[in-house]
UniProtKB/Swiss-Prot annotation:
This is Endoribonuclease YSH1. The active site is at H412 (proton donor). Zn(2+) 1 binds at H73, H75, H167, D188. InterPro entries: Beta_Casp, CPSF73-100_C, MBL, Metallo-B-lactamas, RibonucZ/Hydroxyglut_hydro, RMMBL. The gene is YSH1.
Length: 764
């Protein structure tokens, strides 16, 4: 066992350390420990290394102690070692990611598993050298669970909520809560609204700790419009002179963003570009599969993409000017062209093959658009070397005469965006990850300078930039707060209501003391404060860090696992009707009825085999209702027996009400099987809208108002929702949201309109 495995943090200290991704970009993997809970954040590989050397330092920690693993997004440096963790180590925790991330994850890693090799020795069986196999990938995939944005889940006392992070489709930042301490893990995030993704969200709840990326350190991005213009102009210039342009990209993420830019530019400049004489290709083994995911999750993208999809009824990711290449055998390399090829780091694959083919010609261009990790060919190429080694035989060098340029479209925050976001979060502890040492060090200095005015105060901000496998221990004083539940809450609500009523009638005693010299008055206000003393049982749930104050009468309802006395109740009532009539009424009221004894076969069901050996009396009927309440009828005497609890008590009360009223019930006097004679006409449009508006009334209560002029049937029917500063205007006649200043609320209203149309209207 190593030092990391042996040391356990003090119960009042939150411990953070990285197995990868600290003071480096690649193999992101971070560990959080607090109150006996352990979770891992991301499980990536280092793109500049191969085999076991590319993994985080998993041998430095006992992975069997991990309760939960959260994956922020599908990029290889954040998710590619997940199958290794799940199948090749003693990890036994649960794994969560968003739905789009899981959809992309398997395809991306299926391709990756073909090139991950531990040994480089020729003649070895590569199937035995891979970090993991296709079978490992399939088995791990089945164990991965998904989480929706803005939903909160709990695993072994660890609560976590997913929020939009921008960056790529499906990327999430997680706000984690353990024993009242909240930690925000941003993963890779972007605060810039691009052509298809929204910017990262600010969680509504504050955080005590933020684990934030520092990829670009203190650098500032050029405005997006300028970068797009430079990109298109540079490519246009090269292809106009007969050159070829290679854009190494990740298979998913920035590739789709750049394709949206180029497809629009090619569409607007057809004549200048020879009406299709300069083709654009997207070369990736996963090209079509990846694009199908983007076409599926259009509704999770920004308003611009959704509007295009809705207005034109065509998917924006079905490109008019871009063709797909699965391999270079299909590629006819004649004349100028633009090639987007993966992988983005140029370490191997299609992008590396094209680089080696095109780099000897001066008229060609390699344009790097993403972040380049130290040690990769993409980073090396930016130094403009005279030659590059062949990927298939490193002893052979290839002259590099092509142009090399960089216009970054990497979806990472710059310094200004990062600082603004950190200030909005307001955490007093900042942990920097995902950045090379120098940019990260500069960012730390800038943050400390920015928050220097808070030094030596209660709100002092601490900034950490630990190296891999170095602990950061943060102390949190344990404040125990009990949560009142059940009847105690009702008593307190009643007391508060009474106090509010009394406050309006309360007289404030004013004592005037006159100063004879100045004739000024002093006023002293005397206020009486009433207090309410409540009593109950304090229940501690150490697993989930909950402390609850529960009334004795509510104890069994809220904490069924506690040992309590079970009471069985029995009541008897005389009947003046046949058991057949009672059985009919019971079946009408309750769907869950099991027949134990039926001597006269009134139920037309077989008797439970367990009771065939028991002595049965003439005309006896015994049934079990809702799984617990037993009703026995024999000789016109009904006996009701049940175990005392909230649900069974309610069921027993209902059954007893039936027994006492069965003789006089209208249905008992006359049971009709005929259909009614009157006509059911189809409801008009106004009635349907009224029914749909009931869905909104249930969801939003008094904040929803429907404007309906029943005298003028041609006037459009509208409704409004007012939630504080957030307002929305809905046109029910057209079933659209006309105005809304909140995207989350707008999405929710659109979903309700669809539900109302599909479910409520057809029933009208």
């Amino acid at each position: 066992m190593t030092q990391l495995e042996n040391e356990v943090p003090d119960k009042d200290h939150l411990r953070f350390f990285s197995l990868g991704g600290s003071n480096e970009v690649g193999r992101s993997c971070h560990i959080l420990q607090y109150k006996g809970k352990t979770l891992m954040l991301d499980a990536g590989i280092h793109p500049a290394h191969q085999g076991l050397a590319s993994l985080p330092y998993y041998d430095e920690f006992d992975l069997s102690t991990i309760d939960l693993l959260l994956i922020s997004h599908f990029h290889l440096d954040h998710a590619a070692s997940l199958p290794y963790v799940m199948q090749r180590t003693n990890f036994r925790g649960r794994v969560f990611m968003t739905h789009p991330t899981k959809a992309i994850y398997r395809w991306l890693l299926n391709d990756f598993v073909k090139v991950t090799s531990i040994g480089d020795s020729p003649g070895q069986d590569s199937s035995n050298d891979n970090l993991y196999s296709d079978e490992d990938l399939a088995e791990s995939f089945d164990r991965i669970e998904t989480i929706d944005y803005h939903s909160t889940m709990e695993v072994n006392g660890i609560k976590f909520t997913a929020f939009h992070a921008g960056h790529v489709l499906g990327a999430a930042m997680f706000q984690i809560e353990i024993a009242g301490v909240r930690v925000l893990f941003t993963g890779d995030y972007s605060r810039e609204v691009d052509r298809h993704l929204n910017s990262a969200e600010v969680p509504p709840q504050s955080s005590d700790v933020i684990i934030v990326e520092s990829t670009f350190g203190t650098a500032t991005h050029e405005p997006r419009q300028n970068r797009e213009r430079k990109l298109t102009q540079l490519i246009h210039t090269v292809v106009s002179k007969g050159g070829r342009v290679l854009l190494p990209v990740f298979a998913l993420g920035r590739a789709q963003e750049i394709m949206l830019i180029l497809d629009e530019y090619w569409q607007n400049h057809k004549e200048e570009l020879g009406n299709g004489q300069v083709p654009i290709f997207y070369a990736s083994n996963l090209a079509k599969k990846c694009m199908s995911v983007f076409q599926t999750y259009v509704n999770m993208m920004n308003d611009d993409i959704r509007k295009k999809f809705k207005d034109s009824q065509t998917n924006p990711f079905i490109f008019k000017n871009i063709s797909y290449l699965k391999n270079l055998d299909e590629f006819e390399d004649f004349g100028p062209s633009v090639m987007l090829a993966s992988p983005g780091m140029l370490q191997n694959g299609l992008s590396r093959d094209i680089l080696e083919k095109w780099c000897p010609e001066e008229k060609n261009l390699v344009l790097v658009t993403g972040y380049s990790v130290e040690g990769t060919m993409a980073k090396y190429l930016l130094l403009e070397p005279e030659a590059i080694p062949s990927v298939h035989n490193p002893e052979i060098t290839i002259p590099r005469r092509c142009q090399v340029d960089e216009i970054t479209f990497a979806a990472h925050v710059d310094f200004r965006e990062n600082l603004e976001f950190i200030e909005l979060i307001g955490a007093s502890n900042i942990i920097l990850v995902h950045g090379e040492s120098n940019p990260m060090g500069r960012l730390k200095s800038a943050l400390l300078s920015n928050f220097s005015s808070l030094k030596d105060t209660e709100n002092e901000v601490h900034v950490f930039n630990p190296r891999n496998c170095v602990f950061v221990d943060i102390e949190f004083k344990d404040v125990k707060v009990a949560r009142a539940v059940g009847k105690i809450i009702e008593d307190l609500d009643e007391f508060i209501t009474e106090e509010d009523a009394l406050k309006n009638e309360k007289r404030i005693t004013e004592i005037h003391e006159e100063d004879p010299e100045t004739e000024e008055s002093k006023t002293e206000i005397v206020k009486e404060e009433n207090e309410k003393i409540v009593s109950g049982i304090l229940v501690s749930d150490e697993k989930n860090f909950d402390l609850s104050l529960v009334s004795l009468s509510d104890l069994r309802e809220h904490y069924q696992q506690l040992s309590t006395t079970v009471l069985t109740e029995r009541q008897t009532v005389h009947l003046d009707c046949k058991s057949e009539l009672v059985y009919w009424h019971i079946c009408q009221m309750f769907g869950d009825v099991d027949v134990y004894i039926d001597e006269e076969n009134v139920s037309l069901k077989n008797i439970n085999p367990e009771f065939k050996t028991r002595k049965i009396k003439k005309g006896e009927l015994e049934i079990k209702i809702m799984g617990d309440v037993i009703l026995n009828i024999v000789d016109n005497v009904a006996t009701l027996q049940w175990t005392q609890n909230v649900i069974s008590d309610s069921v027993a009360d209902s059954v007893m009400a039936i027994l006492l009223s069965v003789e006089s019930a209208p249905a008992s006097i006359k049971m009709s099987s005929k259909s009614c004679g009157h006509h059911h006409g189809h409801d008009d449009h106004t009635t349907k809208i009224k029914n749909i508006s009931r869905v909104f009334k249930e969801q939003f209560g008094d904040t929803f108002t429907l404007f309906l002029n029943e005298e003028d049937s041609k006037e459009e029917i509208k409704g409004t929702i007012n939630l504080g500063k957030t307002t929305a205007c809905i046109n029910f006649s057209k079933m659209v949201v006309e105005e809304c200043n909140s995207n989350p609320l707008k999405g929710r209203i659109e979903s309700l309109l669809k539900i109302g149309s599909d479910l409520v209207a057809p029933l009208c």
